[in-house]
């Protein structure tokens, strides 16, 4: 008998196809809308695995609903939605994908910094409104600011923070960072010093009680 796997959010059909000989997949309908907690708790049957994009908070209520559960796979970097201590007690495997979005997130972060520094959003609107030839354009009007020589303060220096730093260095930026339990690096600064010194600040800390509402 095939094992039943619950997938709480859209997953590419071509990816699932190669596993259908061994598993039955329960997927959301419509597929592009994540399952609500109510929908998950309404499912009947022996579920042995859950593939989740971190929308579903997995707690005692969920685990009691699916007593045959053996593994929960988070398609995300974080595990904030999982009660890891409880899963360990119940001997249920928990996995995540810590490196899957590192480069994508770092690329987007660098793009946002460029958009801000070079005023690309404002310039784009200016051109699309056809103001370019009629509104007194002057050279340098949308130049913005150089990144070279500017200081980027990174809050949270894990895989993503380091990937952002590598990209920023290629633009000639100076890198400082703050991270819990690290204070010996010459680039380390306290949070207050980082906020005072930085020209740009990029936040990449995991969500914890300490980081919740860290910046307003």
Sequence positions of predicted segments:
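Rossmann-like adenosine-cofactor binding region
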Residues: 48, 58-62, 174, 180-216
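Glycine-rich Rossmann-fold phosphate-binding loop(s) that bind the pyrophosphate
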Residues: 157-158
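Phosphate-binding beta-alpha-beta segment of Rossmann-like dinucleotide-binding domains, i.e.
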Residues: 98-151, 163-166
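Residue-level detector of anion-binding/catalytic polar loops
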Residues: 24-25, 93, 115, 119, ...
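Short gly/ser/thr-rich secondary-structure transition/capping motifs
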Residues: 30-35, 53-54, 131-139, 181-188, ...
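An N-terminal-biased, well-structured beta-alpha scaffold segment characteristic
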Residues: 1-95, 194-196
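Short beta-strand elements at the ligand-binding edges of bilobed clamshell
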Residues: 93-99, 188-191
